[in-house]
Amino acid sequence: MAERANLVFHNKVIDGTAIKRLISRLIDHFGMAYTSHILDQVKTLGFQQATATSISLGIDDLLTIPSKGWLVQDAEQQSLILEKHHHYGNVHAVEKLRQSIEIWYATSEYLRQEMNPNFRMTDPLNPVHMMSFSGARGNASQVHQLVGMRGLMSDPQGQMIDLPIQSNLREGLSLTEYIISCYGARKGVVDTAVRTSDAGYLTRRLVEVVQHIVVRRTDCGTIRGISVSPRNKNRMMSERIFIQTLIGRVLADDIYIGSRCVAFRNQDLGIGLVNRLITFGTQSISIRTPFTCRSTSWICRLCYGRSPTHGDLVELGEAVGIIAGQSIGEPGTQLTLRTFHTGGVFTGGTAEHVRAPYNGKIKFNEDLVHPTRTRHGHPAFLCYIDLSVIIESEDIIHSVTIPPKSFLLVQNDQYVESEQVIAEIREGTHTFHFKERVRKYIYSDSEGEMHWSTDVSHAPEFTYSNVHLLPKTSHLWILSGGSCGSSLILFSIHKDQDQMNIPFLSVERKSISSLSVNNDQVSQNFLSSDFADKKKSGIPHYSELNGNLGTSHYNFIYSAIFHENSDLLAKRRRNRFLIPFQSIQEQEKEFIPHSGISIEIPINGIFRRNSIFAFFDDPRYRRKSSGILKYGTLKADSIIQKEDMIEYRGVQKFKTKYEMKVDRFFFIPEEVHILPESSAIMVQNYSIIGVDTRITLNLRSRVGGLIRVERKKKRIELKIFSGDIHFPDKTDKISRHSGILIPPGRGKTNSKESKKLKNWIYVQRITPTKKKFFVLVRPVATYEIADSINLATLFPQDLFQEKDNIQLRVFNYILYGNGKPTRGISDTSIQLVRTCLVLNWDQENKNSSVEEVRAFFVEVSTKGLIRDFIRIGLVKSHMSYIRKRNNTPDSGLISADNMNPVYSISPKVGIFQQSLRQNHGTIRMFLNRNKESQSLLILSASNCFRIGPFNHVKYHNVINQSIKKNPLITIKNSPGPLGTSIQISNFFSFLPLLTYNLISVIKYLQLDNLKYIFQVINSYLIDENGRIFNLDPYNNVVLNPFKLNWYFLHKNYHHNYCEETSTIISLGQFFCENVCIAKNEPHLKSGQVLIVQRDSVVIRSAKPYLATPGAKVHGHYREILYEGDTLVTFIYEKSRSGDITQGLPKVEQVLEVRAIDSISLNLEKRIKGWNKCITRILGIPWGFLIGAELTIVQSRISLVNKIQKVYRSQGVQIHNRHIEIIVRQITSKVLVSEEGMSNVFLPGELIGLLRAERTGRALEEAICYRAVLLGITRASLNTQSFISEASFQETSRVLAKAALRGRIDWLKGLKENVVLGGVIPAGTGFNKGLVHCSRQYTNILLEKKKKNLSLFEGDMRDILFYHREFCDSSISKSDFSRI
């Protein structure tokens, strides 16, 4: 050793890492004994210094970091800006939550990093600083909570609480912060109590599965190895992990650099050799691992490698299995206590940022990136490959390479300042975070009407569902307004866009309950002559409008019940008529029979020509039983058009309707039962039964008669025909006919008797066999049909004597065809005839086909009595003037189906032009998709606000443009980012489109003849998609009203720069909050333009919600939503708290081979298909051999990596060898399959992989098997020792099975010998145990051979014992002779 005078004094702090390195180098240079002597001296010195220093901890030693104040203030400011962005609709709730978490997490981490330099500069001998950073007591996380800030906390489930604790424990917590802190404290206490036992049980199972693994040979002779490379296909392995993987291993192959061998096979790898190999840049190194060892129940020295205790090859007889189990289980036991100390503080991760080194201009290739949104909602560019970004300043050009899948946060040619963030890198972070997919539901803050842009899929995700998917980022708008049901709007004749008084709207109800009347007041007649003849004075009784709607997917069906002796008092005018109802709001729970009139109104309130307006099911034409329908005459079948069909509201659907031209029809009843195919029928075909006869076990007949059984697909149809059976003579004429109706008066002539019939009968010929037949005479029910009702008497004479052009016609429909069977399902009745009112009108102009009939519900109050009416009015449609959105101006006219409805059209708009007063509201009509009720939306003055009057509007017949010169606005920035709202930061002019005429408001600015007249001189016209139209300045131009924004370019524009721009306010346009639409007048609220007047705009309040692709929108377009209704569902990944208590269950899941995620069916099919293919290509033995081998190798590597990931995330280092020994045991069994049947093993039997291979080689017969993962519990219960299994779990079952099978335990493991009190075959008892076992094998083998056993059992035993004997003898000869 060098002289003391020549020693160099190092003035450095030695922490735990430095001491580890020191000890390692001391052992390398001086050996174990001398190192322990030196370390004893260090220990003594440490105790002396600690005693002299006498460190104590006081409250004054907790020094708060001075920069904390402004750091927290800065985080609060960022949170406030984030809240505003969310309010404006720029970010959605999930992005806001993510950004909020990262803001506070970054603040907390920065404070933690500041803590050490602060202590080092201000008070380096501070006891808190010395303790926490020496590693002796406490850690940085605990001290950070004492002097920094506690930050974000986890709840007991590991979920993050998004309210941060800004105080530290030195300053003291507020009440809210204290309650949140209690979550963490409780979590720590619970984890310490509960999870410690879990970790202990895991250790026990791990030790159980590998207790018999002992090093028993030096070399197993394997030629296999596992290749380790620092560069993987997917990611780079860090150098530290690479070195840890290699140190202590043994090489499987020689390593050559060029032609020179630098390391040879079976050489163990030390730190020096590993560093040399890394320096040489070796691509891949093949090493031996426990996976490659050829032994079944033990391991060799070279496959295990160096012993972790003394750094040399492991000794023979060492129980490496127990060491492996303890090494994996022990950190789990220790780490559960860590939660208690840190108190459940959330630990997450932030992205790495690339910052600009100095001021300059950014340059990059725009073709290699595409625009996207970051997870915080910021606009960014995503690059798929390595992107070179150049920063140019005056004298320096600096290049930065951005890795793939990173976000670029700056634009090309943008000027950046020094330290500005230019990119965000999310790849390459190796910290492991537990993530889970979470659903986040966004609820509506206010009541109103839902609108969205064209970016939302209007077709629902599934049929009849209300979930819509988003293909791209879009805004959802909730337009404000209070809703009321139709029966609750008081004292108003409410039509769309009418105005009404608001004080009466005090009642709001979310759903309208069904109203009803008493059953005994229901009339059985529909439109009888009583309606026309009686002229009563006073107020007649009317039926009520029922809120129950039909289940039809197309129409509303309102059941309206007319009372007895009541007039159908209807007002009639040219082009319209009113039908009254009476609202009776008592007896809400009465059942409404279907005998009333049902008025059917289409979902859009529009009737087409010849559409059915109402229908009535007469109870006289209703049957409870099944049967066959026959017409009196057969010439009548005129089928009504498909669009006039009515879908029945009951259980069954009707066939096509037939218009009756006959005076009677006949119904032949029969009893029908449809039974499952497997039913046990207790009657025979063509037998005769009486009433109440048992047909099946739980079914009895209602009538008596002839049984007919027909077997059809998957069902049995059993019919009972009632009637008389006759066996006719040859002279009977009736016997030649079958299926005919005989009227009364015509009797059956017979030699013995003759009588006349009183009723119609139906004659049917029955032929049970070819030679025998008889005639069944069945009774018939006859129905007469009354004449059609004349509707001229329905309406009283009109004083004005106007020509009627709306007609109502009455049609009777038979709902079943001639000879068609009717089937009643369970107890439902069958309606045979339906009476319908059909609406029609005369066309005034033969060339015009735009007339249509609209239905409105009207409620009128007269002297305190409230009456409901349906108002049917003929109006002209304005739809044909509306063009489709995004069409070019010359695309022609389209139909109303393609319009994007903003507001319903009303023919009278005079009232709507008035300004909104405080006590007035505007009515909006709605028809809900759920068909519960018709709803109305009331817009009051509180829902709208006015902008204006504007002073800068000039009236000319040419469009006046207020021009703001700004050459830096590019065209692509002018339209809104979502296509629905414009970006108005640089628009300072408000420009309504005006001509000489006054403007009436329908859906847009309506000029004369419903056309838009523009005179654009020397200008181009640009639509919002950026297309340029060069317009003829001398022609009138018809523009699309659904183009939300038109921009005017002067002719001398250049480089796509917009020199002159103007704002056009369109009706129905959406504006976000805080943008300018007029000069110096910011827009204070978000909303939709409702009224455009000469100098001002009325805007309806609206709340925007942002939704990104993958979100699900609940509800339909223009549906009324209530406060608290679910609006959007986001599905996103969320980090969980990354402590060991979340990690241990994952380790257990992997080791017990439980399914973590459900595998899709497609993947399973593909795997099965691959197995079949490889078997077919390679043949049965090779296919199974290679398939099982590949599966086992890949699954082993994957399992090791998964377990290591959990422990490394906690900073725990476990050598791969320990995990490999465990994983080898749970993957070492294979399942014998049924494909190639062998004489050795049974299908479904679990055998060792090596045993299956050796048996196959010995027998020269293919054994078909497939790989199986057992799990540590199942592997412990599938060993060669039943004593070991019984001492682990299920003792009685294991011992009973072992006794029945006659199993023999060879006491090869440690546990069996411990249980029986023998010497364990490890360590010093290694030799004795093995020799003893060998002798035992031989004796038993000889005894067995002496006995006469069956041939099969003898063969089995011979093979197995030969193998064992050979192995043991070779061990004892080769290895033990040297010891």
Curated annotation (Swiss-Prot):
Keyword Transmembrane helix carried by entry: no
According to UniProt, the reaction catalysed is:
RNA(n) + a ribonucleoside 5'-triphosphate = RNA(n+1) + diphosphate
CDD domains membership = RNAP_beta'_C (cd02655)
Which compartments is it annotated to reside in?
Plastid, Chloroplast
Which major enzyme category is it?
transferase
Keywords carried by this UniProt record: Chloroplast, DNA-directed RNA polymerase, Metal-binding, Nucleotidyltransferase, Plastid, Transcription, Transferase, Zinc
Sorted alphabetically, the Gene Ontology BP terms of this entry are: DNA-templated transcription
Q: How is the cofactor bound?
A: Binds 1 Zn(2+) ion per subunit.
Q: What is its EC number?
A: 2.7.7.6
GO MF annotations, alphabetized: DNA binding; DNA-directed RNA polymerase activity; zinc ion binding
The record, for PANTHER family, names: DNA-DIRECTED RNA POLYMERASE SUBUNIT BETA
Query: What does the similarity note say?
Result: Belongs to the RNA polymerase beta' chain family. RpoC2 subfamily.
Q: What is its quaternary makeup?
A: In plastids the minimal PEP RNA polymerase catalytic core is composed of four subunits: alpha, beta, beta', and beta''. When a (nuclear-encoded) sigma factor is associated with the core the holoenzyme is formed, which can initiate transcription.
Q: Which NCBIfam families match?
A: rpoC2_cyan (TIGR02388)
Q: What is this protein's name? A: DNA-directed RNA polymerase subunit beta''
